[in-house]
């Protein structure tokens, strides 16, 4: 198994494909998630990836497993001290191979290198394996930090 991680800024079509799979999965498990996407101006995000995830304050990666598109992750600036992990997604056929771990480790390392003090994220209760992984890396539960309309959202923070 050969894994390769690449910067995704010039691969908008592949990013869009993975983001769509990710959001479709979330909506399938909780139809109210569509309202959250609308609040986040999700359609704008896809069209302007660099404005949300651009260098020097953000990151956007794709990962390939044996040359097949396997997953993605993003990092966006909230303010000078805080960043947010976004759009962690590993395609179902590639899960269980520690690809999610590689993506999370990379984005944490990048956040430290940029100089952020804290990384935030929000997730949903049915993403149990992701929540377990976040806790393994030191994330802990916090109160809401964004305008999510999702009553079930779980908010987490990592002190970098």
Model-inferred region functions:
Residues 77, 91-97, 125-126:
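Active-site acidic-Proline motif in GNAT/NAT acetyltransferases
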Residues 90, 96-109, 136:
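Conserved acetyl-CoA-binding loop-helix of GNAT-fold acetyltransferases
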Residues 6, 20-49:
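Conserved GNAT-fold acetyl-CoA-binding loop/helix
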Residues 62, 68-76, 84:
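Conserved beta-strand in the GNAT
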Residues 45-62:
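A short helix-loop-beta-strand connector motif used in the catalytic cores of GNAT acetyltransferases and
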Residues 117-160:
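C-terminal "cap" of GNAT-fold acetyltransferases
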Residues 1-17, 21, 160:
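Conserved N-terminal entry element of GNAT/NAT acetyltransferase domains
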């Amino acid at each position: 198994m050969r894994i390769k991680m690449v910067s995704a800024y010039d691969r908008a079509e592949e990013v869009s494909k993975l983001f769509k799979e990710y959001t479709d999965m979330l909506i399938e498990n909780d139809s109210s998630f569509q309202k959250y996407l609308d609040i986040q101006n999700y359609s704008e995000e896809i069209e302007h990836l660099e404005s949300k995830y651009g260098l020097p304050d953000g990151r956007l990666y794709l990962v390939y497993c044996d040359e097949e598109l396997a997953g993605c992750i993003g990092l966006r600036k909230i303010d000078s001290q805080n960043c947010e992990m976004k759009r962690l997604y590993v395609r179902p056929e590639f899960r269980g191979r520690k690809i999610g771990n590689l993506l999370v480790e990379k984005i944490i390392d990048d956040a430290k290198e940029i100089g952020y003090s804290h990384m935030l994220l929000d997730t949903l209760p049915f993403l149990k394996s992701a929540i377990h992984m976040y806790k393994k890396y030191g994330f802990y539960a916090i109160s809401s930090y964004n305008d999510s309309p999702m009553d079930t959202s779980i908010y987490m923070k990592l002190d970098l």
